Structure formats: C-alpha cells, structure tokens
Regions:
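Short, low-complexity, Lys/Arg-enriched N-terminal segments of secretory-pathway carbohydrate enzymes
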Residues: 1-12
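Short helix-onset patch at the extreme N-terminus, typifying the N->h transition
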Residues: 7, 22-23
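Non-catalytic cap/lid and distal C-terminal segments of serine-dependent acyl enzymes
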Residues: 18-21, 28-340
C-alpha cells in the first residue's frame, strides 16, 4: 500500500469516528432532555407543585385540575372542578364525592346532577378514582390479592386529602396574613385567611368511606352524607365483599368489631350527618342505615346533647333503589342539609 493510500484510509477512519462520536452526543442529549421532561411531569412533581403554597400563593384552586397520586404499582386519578359561582354572596366550599365499589368516580357527574348543582352553589367538587376500594384502614393478610390494588382510606387521607390543607381544604385552621412587627419585636397579624368549609358524601360503599373519614378527621369536615351505605359488617357475616377484605368472621371476629365498624364507633362522630336509603334497595338492606341512626340516637341520649355534638338526619325513601336515580335525588337533599 502506498503512502497516499495509507493516508486516505486513516483520514476516512478518523472522519467515521468523529461522526460516531457526534451521533452518540446527540442521542445522549436527547435522552437527557426526555428524562428531564418526564421527571417534571411525574406524579411526585405534580404533588410537590400542588403542595407548595409559597409558589402558588393561592387559597383553593384557580382552575379545574386533574393530577395523579402514586398508590402501590399505579397512579390514582384525582380531579378538582372549581366553582365559578363563588362571589361576595356565595362563599367557596369543597365537596368530596366518593364512589361505590367498582363505580367510576366520574359517574357522580355524568349520571347525576349533584356535581353541577354543587358547583352552582359555590362548592368546588373533588373526585378520586377509588376503584374497588371498600375504604378499609389496612391491607389485611386475609384480603384477596386483587383487592390490594385499590386504595385504603388511610392512603386517601394521607396522600390525597391532607396535602390540600395548605390550600385551605380539609382543615379547621386558618392562615395568619398581613404581618406587622410591633415595638417589642414580636410579629402581629392584621387578618386571618379562613379555611374553606369542606364536606364529604359517598354512595354505596363510598358512604362507608364518607362516614369513616368524618369520624377519624372531624377537624377536616363540616358535614358528611351516606347514601345507601353499609355500616355494620356484623349484620352481614356472609357478605363476600366483607369476607374478602376482612377475612372470615369466625377467624378474626375482633376485626369485624374494630375500626372498620361504623355502627360500633358511632359515638365518635362529631360532625352533622345526612343518611338516606331506599326501602326497595336489593343490594344493601335499608336496615343498615336505620340501625346506624338508632345507634346514634341512643348514644346521644346516653351521652347528653352537650357531649355529643353531631346531629343526624335520616331519610327512608319508600320506592328508592340502589341506583343513580336515587343517589341523584338524595345527593341534592344532602347538599340542602349541608347548607342549612
């Protein structure tokens, strides 16, 4: 090979190596850009933005918002619809609507007029995709494997609701504003930004979630409503839904009487409650609501009205069924109750 030929081969090799290096650099930069973009849109980043009141500097939400919160191996959809009716005569409120077992959360809005009515009355509306949740506090060893993929109420509170306290929801505490430093160096505040009154309503198993959240977090809610709910698993020991969540009664009887039994915890309820059930309900017997109301009234009489602050309104609808027609009608009645 001549000297010229060798020089040509070396030159071609160097040029090819330069092209390869350039391609690698371009690909690496593109991958880093995609990674950065993906990270900025991840659920954790979205939550960080939602929770950072110093960045947003707002009370409530400024516009309709959808975001996702991680739960185990998936992300749970959360939707906030913002009322446009809020003004001097219509104060802002929040309504959390909980779906029943295997019901789409959005059906509160697509199959009833509860959402639109609430929005017209100054309620922001919150929907959470709970899937087949039975609103338990834990994932018990006996729980069916596929049920574990759906959120507990403890997760709902800690990961979804509690983070919104910085925006004024789900809290009874205001935020001091307009600081003024006085002569002795202390800081005084001219005003207080008041919390946004928050209410919770659930249908079917969602009614369980609504009342349990109200019992466990009375500071977060001004009122609760349960439509067609089941509140005492002891009266349904053969119910497959309860067995698949809690385990068989004969094996773990204490669990059926424990923290997931609303009727046995009724003396803990501190907020006003609206109960409604259809007499023709062939899914959950109306006696579940009737017996809960009776237990509440017995507890009130035993404790005295001064020590048990909650009030409960109980409505039995003669031809009411376990369907969206009933939930739509009684959901509006519950809104009336909240505004009394």
């Amino acid at each position: 090979m001549t000297w010229a030929s060798k020089y040509y081969v070396v030159a071609v090799f160097r040029r090819m190596r330069l092209i390869v290096f350039c391609c690698i650099a371009v690909i690496t930069a593109a991958l880093m850009s995609l990674s950065k973009e993906s990270s900025s849109n991840s659920p954790s980043k979205v939550l960080q933005g939602l929770n950072d009141s110093s960045v947003h500097g707002m009370w409530g939400f400024g516009a309709d918002t959808v975001y996702f919160v991680p739960y185990r191996s998936k992300s749970i959809r959360v939707e906030i619809q913002v009322s446009k009716a809020v003004g001097a005569d219509v104060p802002r409120k929040m309504l959390l609507l909980l779906p029943g077992w295997n019901y789409a959360d959005t059906q509160w809005c697509t199959r009833t007029s509860v959402c639109s009515t609430a929005l017209s009355r100054g309620f922001d509306v919150m929907l959470v995709e709970m899937g087949k949740s039975v609103y338990m506090d834990s994932l018990y060893p006996e729980m069916r494997v596929d049920y574990r993929e759906h959120p507990t109420r403890v997760w709902l509170w800690k990961e979804v609701l509690q983070p919104l306290q910085v925006r004024g929801y789900f809290t009874d505490k205001g935020v001091p504003e307009d600081p003024v430093r006085i002569s002795n160096g202390k800081v005084m505040y001219k005003s207080l930004r008041l919390p946004i009154p928050t209410f919770v309503m659930g249908l079917s198993t969602g009614a369980r979630g609504a009342l349990l959240l109200a019992i466990e977090h009375p500071e977060a809610f001004r009122g609760c409503a349960g439509l067609s709910g089941d509140y005492n698993p002891l009266s349904m020991k053969s119910d497959n839904l309860m067995i698949n969540c809690l385990g068989k009664y004969e094996q773990v009887p204490w669990r059926w009487r424990g923290s997931n039994n609303i009727q046995m915890r009724i003396n803990e309820l501190k907020v006003p409650c609206y109960l409604a059930h259809g007499e023709a309900d062939n899914v959950v017997p109306f006696q579940q609501s009737q017996q809960l109301f009776d237990a509440h009234e017995n507890a009130r009489r035993a404790a005295g009205s001064s020590s048990m602050r909650s009030t409960m309104k109980w409505v039995l609808v003669k031809n009411g069924m376990h369907n969206y027609t009933f939930w739509g009608e009684q959901g509006i009645r519950a809104l009336d109750f909240f505004e009394e």
